Amino acid sequence: MPEGKKLPPAPMLRLLVFAQTGLIVTLLAVVGAYFAPRAGLEDPFLLAFAQGEGADLWELLRPQLLAGLLVGAPGAAVFLAGYYVVFRPWLDDATVVEEVLIRWGLLSLLAWLISLLTPGGGVTATGVWLSILVSGIAFAAGHAPSYAAAGCKLTPRFWTAMLVLNLWVSLYCGWLFWQHGLAAAIVAHMLVHAAWLPLDLRVARRATT
C-alpha cells in the first residue's frame, strides 16, 4: 500500500471482492456451458439436472464423488508433503497460491480452441492435457499480483513453489474433470483445503510459540 493511502472500509472491500468473484464465476460458467460440450467435456450429472430428465441423479453423481475421493486423498497428501517438506522452508512468510482452478470455463475453452488447430477439428487427449497444463500455469501466474500487493516476495523460489504445487493439483483435478465430471474435480480440490487449513494453522501456532 503506498504511503499516505488507506484501504477502503472493510464492508466495501468485501463487497468489491464478492462482486469481482461473482462476475468472474458467472462469466466462466457461461463459457463452460457453451464450450464444454464442444470440447468433449460434458458432465452427465449436470446435463441430466439441467434438462430435468427423470434419471436417477444420485447414480450419475456417485461415481464422480468416489473418483474424487480416491484420487483426491493421495493427491492432497502429495501436495501437503511438497508444501511442508520441500517448499515451505524456502518461502519465508509467503504462501502458496490457493488453487481455485475454474476447469469448467477456462479448461473447456482452451480444449475447444486447441481442437480447432487439430486435423479434422477433433478433441484429442494431447489437446486436453495441454489445456490442463496451460490453465494451471495461467491460474498460478494470474494471482501473483495480488500476492505481491499483500507483501509476498515473488522470488524464484516462490514462483517455483506456486507453479509446481498448483500444476500438481491441476493435473489430477483436470484429469478427474475430463474423465469423470466436475463434481469429481470439486471433491478432490476440497480435500486439499480440508487437510491443508488445520495443518497450516497448527504449523503457524508452533512457529509463534
Please identify what each model-predicted range represents.
Residues 1-91, 107, 111, 115, ...:
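Specific transmembrane helices
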Residues 92-209:
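Transmembrane helix-loop-helix hairpins at the membrane interface
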